Amino acid sequence: MGGHIRLHQDGHRIFHHSGIAAFAEYAVMSVHSLVKIDPTIPPEHAALLGCAVMTGAGAVINTSEVTVGDTVAVVGAGGVGLSAMMAAVAAGSTKIIAIDISDEKLEITRKFGATHAFNATDPDIVSKVKAQTDGGVHIAIESAGVPKALELAFDVTRIGGKTVAAGLPSPSRNVSISHFVLGAQERSLKGSYMGSCIPSRDIPKFLTMYQQGILRIDHLAGDQIKLEDLNEAFDLMKKGGALRTVLVP
């Protein structure tokens, strides 16, 4: 392949996301994709910074700029959403609403800082969230990657509230929100790609918070599997039965 293509199969180039994807024992990486970390940090915990923690915590700290006393809703209780909840606690939020379609996932959200939990399929969920938050949350983080989740996140914010889209759906998916409410109630809607993070700046910061016991990244670590069992991990993820599965040598 001339030595200039990093990933290939049978002579064909393999395209991948963010320049870092590599399910392999060894990989050649761009220097721009590397961040030096404290060697005392367990690699199975540091690995979680690559997406889940950086995306979720970054959406709270960088994109939405949660401050002390803000009420926060997180729609989607996967790895990104749980990371957002931990970051909301660290930022000083005293009321954190967890929303998901899975009661099983909602049960574990309190371990990550949620003070209230609601099933997204509840037809009265918007009124229930607003009743708990004096008219709606200050900030809602969508971390499910589906349009309905973003619409719900927008609906549970208060007048002047901010909705942050951290999930990534298919490029063809669209959302429907009230143009009138967006303008008349001075709400805002903002995107957050990878937590608006600069890895060289934010990964060390988040790892310091982990070492201080502020971001319990270790709570996100699920099963550890071998590389040859990778497909089983994907199957588990599709079923919604995994937090963050870690590949180990």
Predicted features and spans:
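Glycine-rich phosphate/adenylate-binding loop and adjacent beta-alpha elements
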Residues: 1-34
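Mid-domain Rossmann-like dinucleotide-binding core that forms the NAD(H)/NADP(H) cofactor-binding site
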Residues: 32-33, 38-123, 127
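A generic alpha-to-beta junction signature in SAM-dependent methyltransferases
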Residues: 66, 133, 144, 155-158
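Generic hydrophobic/aromatic pocket-lining and core-packing "Φ" positions
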Residues: 85, 106, 150-154, 179
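Residues in the short beta-alpha loop(s) of Rossmann-like NAD(P)-binding domains
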Residues: 102, 169, 195
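C-terminal hydrophobic helical "lid"/dimerization subdomain
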Residues: 123, 147, 151-155, 200-249
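A short acidic, Gly/Pro-enriched loop at the edge of an enzyme's catalytic core
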Residues: 124, 128-140
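Rossmann-fold dehydrogenase core element
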Residues: 161-164, 176-219, 243
